[in-house]
Amino acid sequence: MLFTLIVCLTIISSLATFLLLFGDSPSFRNTPIQKLRNSLLSISRDIFQFYHWLDEKLNGQLLKILNWLVPVGYVMVVTVCFQQFLTHTLPMLSSPGLFRLFTIYFSMVLIYASTILAAFSDPGRITTINLKSYPYTPNQLIFFDGKTCSTCHIAKPARSKHCSVCNQCFLLYDHHCVWINNCVGYYNYKWFMLFLISNINMLGYGGWLCYWALTPVSWRKITSTNNANKVTGIFLILCSIFIVITTLFTFLHLRYIYLGVTTNELDKWSEIDHLVGLGVLYQIEPSIANENYVERAILDGNAVYISLKDERILIYNSNVKNFKLQLIQSVEDDLVNIYDHGFWNNLIERLKW
């Protein structure tokens, strides 16, 4: 009964994960899949609003506890699956041998180790010490000099962000991962990638073992024979589903590394791309207060040029002749991402030891 419940919850969570990750992609626009995703997000917002209300009533402690439900639930599900695999599937493998036993147990240990490392490692809390060796500077396009976090009241270095869940600012912020209840940033991105790779290894290798365990058995009899066949067949189906989702998500992060952006920065670059699409982003010479780019706006019927940093008016119609304005027509051709040093160098930077 417990195993059946876990399987059902696993299937539901995998479908929900797929909807959240890919339901808004252009391929699914104006389809039932996007509508399901929007409904899921709407329900999630209502639930989170209730959580925040109840959390306030309990002096901010409830949400901290609830944040651990997903990683604890993940570890519990994985542990039960491991137990079922060792009990039912492993005996079906003829003469597994020492090497195969080693790889099986190593894969299991790697799951626990990577989860612990990703969940409890420092993502990159901002201190005066680590700022001295922090390599990134503002590009004056999506990150600017002199920015201060309105919550922490500390200086915000380039590529950092405040996490509302952890209530802290982190260097090279990527995203807050619910599966580990931790932010992914400057110091622990390597453990996050290890977490993903260890899951891909578990799903791929585990699925392969389940397939070979079932090979001598007629597929028509899998669901109608003994419990071991049923468990192994279910594992094969689950591994086949989850490895696709996990692999796609991992390749998505590899694509971000290739582009030289983080998940957080992708949204910022999307805003820049939107301004370019509207034809209102300009490069200026000479720069004003170290700002090299401005946005054209209309004030009282006249064109003005405002700061991307704080939306102050930097250039009025009366003094526009003092500056050289060049319209940015393409993000790819006219703008340079100073944080992109090529895929291999980007990867080395992200997997910082």
Swiss-Prot record:
One Pfam short name: DHHC
Subcellular location(s) per record: Endoplasmic reticulum membrane
Mode of membrane association: Multi-pass membrane protein
UniProt KW keywords: Acyltransferase, Endoplasmic reticulum, Lipoprotein, Membrane, Palmitate, Transferase, Transmembrane, Transmembrane helix
Cytoplasmic side: 23-61, 122-190, 255-353
GO cellular component terms given for this protein: endoplasmic reticulum; endoplasmic reticulum membrane; Golgi apparatus
Catalytic activity: L-cysteinyl-[protein] + hexadecanoyl-CoA = S-hexadecanoyl-L-cysteinyl-[protein] + CoA
InterPro entries cross-referenced by the UniProt entry: Palmitoyltrfase_DHHC, PFA4/ZDH16/20/ERF2-like
GO molecular function: protein-cysteine S-palmitoyltransferase activity
Domain DHHC, first and last residues per copy: 147-197
Family label: Belongs to the DHHC palmitoyltransferase family. SWF1 subfamily.
Record's function text: Palmitoyltransferase that targets several endosomal SNAREs. Palmitoylates the SNAREs at cysteine residues close to the cytoplasmic end of their transmembrane domain. May have a role in the cellular quality control of transmembrane domain-containing proteins.
Name of the protein in question: Palmitoyltransferase SWF1
